[in-house]
């Protein structure tokens, strides 16, 4: 992969900022190849060719539709299950499907150790406690770190029955055209487009890269600043060290805006470990940087059962 491939990946979100809302990378299905081309300096045809290549390589195998748990009156918590033997991770990802309320899991490696991060719903305290106990039983070491709250921007509107129907169609057909969605819910394309845009804009739902996609060769670099350090000055220094820097949005990593003051985070290429190590050392030498931590994504899995059951119940009862 080259810098243009990474730039295209970055601008799958129109603002060029990366978000992970308890899932894989959030993308905007409305972003066109032409809009990406304007950001990365290629022709529209060139962007389309690059997207096809990334898809053929397995990095962009498709999208999934995620529904905001807040529309069901729930929130998300995250816990970490330590992994000592690499062979323990694949069966654990499969077994997590047995735990009601688990929606996503990611196998990660960071400066400290390897773990599977498990994202699950928090609806009532007893339910959260029960799910955490089940995770402990599945954990290869019998240990679970957490859970801790994982903040996602709440949905800003009340959904109508038509909204729920469009959300169902969009979840069933995450890559369908607006005309296809309109046909599925028996409304005009204009109505379907308007409603879908409202659902996306109010964060009732979003698109994410499919969990069948290969992990991009990227590392999450989390940087803690010293007290009094100026973030913009540090960012300018980072740009000279990491030519490819995909900033994580303030609302994109599970912390509410304003709660992570003094922390900068972004994705950087990890194809060359020695180059990444050198970049981290140079990052630590920046005036105002207290620490820097790398996290690598090794794999992930989605678990749709809880969301699908909640959505079916809403469709049965919506007026």
Where are these regions (language model features)?
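A compositional/biophysical signature of low hydrophobicity enriched in polar/charged and small residues
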Residues: 1-319
């Amino acid at each position: 992969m080259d810098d243009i491939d990474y730039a295209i990946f970055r601008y799958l979100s129109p603002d060029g900022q990366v978000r992970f809302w308890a899932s894989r990378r959030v993308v905007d299905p409305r972003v066109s190849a032409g809009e990406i081309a304007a950001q990365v300096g290629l022709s529209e045809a060139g962007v389309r060719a690059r997207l096809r290549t990334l898809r053929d390589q397995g990095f962009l195998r498709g999208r999934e539709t995620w529904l905001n748990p807040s529309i069901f009156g729930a929130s998300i918590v995250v816990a970490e299950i330590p992994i000592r033997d690499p062979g323990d991770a694949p069966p654990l990802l499969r077994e997590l499907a047995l735990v009601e309320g688990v929606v996503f899991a990611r196998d990660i490696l960071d400066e400290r150790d390897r773990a599977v991060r498990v994202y699950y719903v928090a609806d009532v305290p007893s339910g959260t406690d029960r799910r955490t106990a089940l995770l402990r039983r599945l954990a290869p070491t019998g240990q679970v770190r957490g859970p801790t709250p994982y903040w996602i921007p709440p949905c800003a509107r009340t959904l109508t029955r038509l909204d729920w129907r469009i959300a169902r169609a969009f979840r069933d057909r995450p890559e369908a055209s607006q005309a296809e969605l309109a046909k599925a819910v028996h409304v005009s394309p204009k109505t379907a487009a308007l409603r879908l845009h409202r659902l996306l804009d109010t964060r009732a739902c979003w698109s994410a890269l499919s969990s069948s996609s290969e992990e991009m060769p990227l590392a999450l670099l989390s940087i803690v600043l010293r007290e009094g350090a100026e973030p913009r000055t540090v960012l300018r220094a980072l740009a000279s060290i990491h030519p490819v820097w995909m900033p994580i949005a303030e609302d994109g990593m599970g912390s509410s805006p304003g709660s992570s003051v003094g922390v900068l985070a972004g994705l950087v290429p990890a194809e060359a470990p020695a180059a990444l190590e050198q970049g981290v050392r140079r990052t630590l030498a920046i005036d105002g940087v207290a620490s820097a931590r790398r996290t690598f994504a090794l794999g992930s899995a989605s678990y749709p059962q809880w969301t699908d059951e909640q959505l079916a119940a809403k469709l049965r009862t919506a007026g």
